Amino acid sequence: MKNLGRWLILGLAFLTIPAKAALDIVITEGVDAARPIAVVPFVWQGSTPMPQQISDVVMSDLTRSGTFKPMDELGLPQRNLGSLAQMDLKAWSNVAAEAVVMGTVKPYGPDQYLVNFELIDLVKAQMQSGGPQSASEYLLDSRETVISSAQFRQYGHRISDIVYEKLTGIRGAFLTRIAYVVVDHKAKSPYKLMIADYDGYNEQMLLRSPEPLMSPAWSPDGRRLAYVSFENKQAEVFVQDIYTQQRTKVTSFPGINGAPTFSPDGKKLALTLSKDGQPEIYVADIATKAIKRVTNHYAIDTEASWTPDGKSLIFTSERGGRPQIYQVALASGKVTRLTFEGEWNLGGSISPDGRSMVFVNRTNGKFNIARMDLETRFMQVLTTTRLDESPSIAPNGTMVIYGTTYQGQQVLAAVSMDGRFKARLPVGQGEVKSPAWSPFL
């Protein structure tokens, strides 16, 4: 837990694990209030088994978004339905869903498959009298793509992105990834820096170490991770290319080197250093290693995060007596306090649209994830789990992934930005902590 004593300190081969979910998402709250949608199993037009049912991926994505609730397949009036031309609108007239996703898959060549999918506005179809003048009246989107057998899951995420954006106006985040640290104290090298698809599939290990690894942070282009490693018996900040495995040591000063986070242009890191005594916020140029001190106070300053415009940092400080979140303008150095409610507020990050801040709030001794509207300063506690920490916002600003404790074990969990939808991501072995959600990829 990021208590006052710990948050100032905590801040090789490319191993690919088979395409299964290492982090199984367990939805705990919020599905019943979601928007109903029908996802019809994609029609297979081949003589051998289909490599994977794309509709399964789409259904899981839409459910995990917290926004949609796919209908049970047994409740669909048509299950062998691949296009609008085959749709019996009368059979669908009383179906309580706002849209229908359907498609076909057929062999196209050696390890090639032609996928067609359509998104139908069912509400409009049900309200229309006299039948459509053209298919485009009901057809919200239609795509045709050739993929390989290894791309079925990825293309399912792509379809989910399209459906989500068409129906909500918000870009989908189903093709994103998460980084996190797994700790297995039974292993000789217990610390592993991992990345995986947002839903836990395609888990990959970037680094394994006998010493602690912590605080992973994505670059804006999604190609690099910054993190803290104690592999050399002291805290050091590294930046690693996740594709080439090339690593760059950015800081290795005596004392604390912690909590790195990339600037919006990807050229700098904001981080915490104690090289001059007290932990302070610095900005380091990744290419030149030049550093610039940002804060100068006798209290602890740590956990910096950039505003989307790159002109300010928010950070945690105890300069008011207890940990609270402040904002510092990089040009002037002016510091403004942002949080006042609760006993502690720490670990803040700004939503991509710049309107909200997500952070850890302690009230009555309980650590939970909270969100604050930066214009009205209204604060909402989003979670009811225990010992919550390390919130990270999805790039579309709709969900937050964070660390928590469940049945005595550190796990990851997710909550929607309105607090309505909640899910848990337990892992099979070891503990999982320090999640970081990637940008759009």
Curated annotation (Swiss-Prot):
Gene3D superfamilies: TolB, C-terminal domain, TolB, N-terminal domain
Key words, A-Z: Cell cycle, Cell division, Periplasm, Signal
Subcellular location: Periplasm
InterPro entries linked to this entry: 6-blade_b-propeller_TolB-like, PD40, Tol-Pal_TolB, TolB_N
Pfam families documented for this protein: PD40, TolB_N
Disulfide bonds: none
Oligomer and partners: The Tol-Pal system is composed of five core proteins: the inner membrane proteins TolA, TolQ and TolR, the periplasmic protein TolB and the outer membrane protein Pal. They form a network linking the inner and outer membranes and the peptidoglycan layer.
NCBIfam families: propeller_TolB (TIGR02800)
Free-text function comment from the UniProt entry: Part of the Tol-Pal system, which plays a role in outer membrane invagination during cell division and is important for maintaining outer membrane integrity.
Protein name in UniProt: Tol-Pal system protein TolB
Gene that this polypeptide is encoded by: tolB
